[in-house]
Amino acid sequence: MSVLIEEAENRLRRAADEHFDLQDLKDSVANHQKSRIKDAYHLTFGNYVYLLRDADRWHKLGWRLDQDQVVDLVERVKNVRNDLMHFATDPLSEDKFAAVTGLLQLLRTAEPNP
């Protein structure tokens, strides 16, 4: 599962680097974090929720996907990732697995280059 989440994060990072300028990236983080942002590598999964939620930034992507659906999936996958990183012992639910694979399918459609 972590490999799929890593692929999703890499695709988000690549899209952010290709479509957004540094100010867009900094605008997606809290004020106390702005100075550490140099490129999309420095964004957390949670920052992508805020980055993609903004209508103007969404438009810059040029993705023909439903913005609300993508943002919802990014937020759900962020939570799955956090659960995994904190060594959750419960098996991954079908809903969580579906969120990860659903986001990855959308990202592969929007940004087909691996």
Which residue stretches match the model-derived regions?
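Amphipathic alpha-helical interface elements
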Residues: 1-114
